[in-house]
Structure formats: structure tokens, C-alpha cells
């Protein structure tokens, strides 16, 4: 949404990746049954110089240095891609409403990334199409987790359940959902980063094990 002062707010929902046997390729966006918002928001408005403010329930869990925040990195990456495309940018003030717990398995980083890029793309008059923006989101997600994957950013950005294609166009396909499907999501309060979780996984899995457990 926006107002006459050219300020935008973008919301990005929580998501779950690695759905069932779809490791790194199948993800789903989450929406509470009571209609409340579950996700991060990013506000953007014009400024004389770039700034990032963090607010919200889990803002205190973020790096104290704004330059280390993924939203700041999204801004700089967006500006780099704009320059490559021969387009201009200007300084903005960003506010991240950090409403998702970090390292929770709810796509916390993806939510911040998607909200940031969606806000930036809207503010600068939509210079990038859906697939291009999604690839950019995957690049930034990869900076956090150690490898590019879309199973959180894709459903977070597009909604519903998404299947990654392995190509750049389209990056993902939307899968049909049954309106009567509901997910029970439990958060233990334990924080485990995506990078740490991936390091725990074995580098190889025997064929018999893979066939047995999918």
C-alpha cells in the first residue's frame, strides 16, 4: 500500500520450506485461521540518506549494526541491479517490523527479504518483473543460508504452495491447494539458523535409506 507522499509498506507472510519430500523445492505460505497477520513488514519512504530502523517483537534479536541486517543488504543489492539495468535510485529510509522469531523454521529471513524487495520494487516504479525479483530474493537468501534456494522466498512472495522448477523462467510453479487443508505449526522457542541446520545433514545418503524415507 502507499500514500500521496510516495511511501510504501510491504507485508510478507511466514512460510515453511522442505515440505514433505520436497527438500529445497517445495514450500508453502502460512496464514493464521483467525485472519491475523503472521509475517514481517517493511516500510519505505524518501530520505536524504539511507537508513534502517528495526522495530517489532523480535527486533532485539537482530544485529545491532544496520549494515549487517539483511534488509540493508537487500537495498544495496537492489541498487546494484538497478545500475546494471541503467536505472537510477535514490536514498530511502526503511523500517523493518520484525514480527517473526529468528531461526524458527517459519521463514523469518525470507519474510524480511521478500518484504524489502517488494517495497523497493514498488517504490522505484516496478523496474523488475516477478521472476527477476524472485531470483534476487533467492540470491539474498543464499547469503544467509550458504546456498541459493527458493522454497521459502517463493511461497512467501507468491503465496500458496510452490514447486521450484530448477530454471530461471519460470523459477517456480504454483500448486493447487485444498481449501480444507490446515497446518498445525509449533514453535519451540529454540533458534537454529538455516546454515547451522544444513551443516548437520549428512553429505551423502545411501540409496536404501532415501527410498525408505523419501
PLM region spans:
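Short glycine/threonine-rich catalytic loop with a Thr-x-Gly-x-Asp
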Residues: 104-111, 207-212
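Short, conserved micro-motifs enriched in small and acidic residues
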Residues: 65-69, 106-114, 148
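ATP-binding N-lobe of GHMP and related small-molecule kinases
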Residues: 3-104, 122, 126-128
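Predominant activation on well-ordered alpha-helical scaffold segments within soluble catalytic domains
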Residues: 39, 72-76, 114-121, 134, ...
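ATP-dependent small-molecule kinase catalytic core of the GHMP/sugar-kinase superfamily
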Residues: 129-214
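Short, glycine/charged-enriched secondary-structure capping and boundary segments
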Residues: 24-27, 110, 200-201
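DPxDG-like acidic metal-binding loop motif
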Residues: 106-130, 157-159
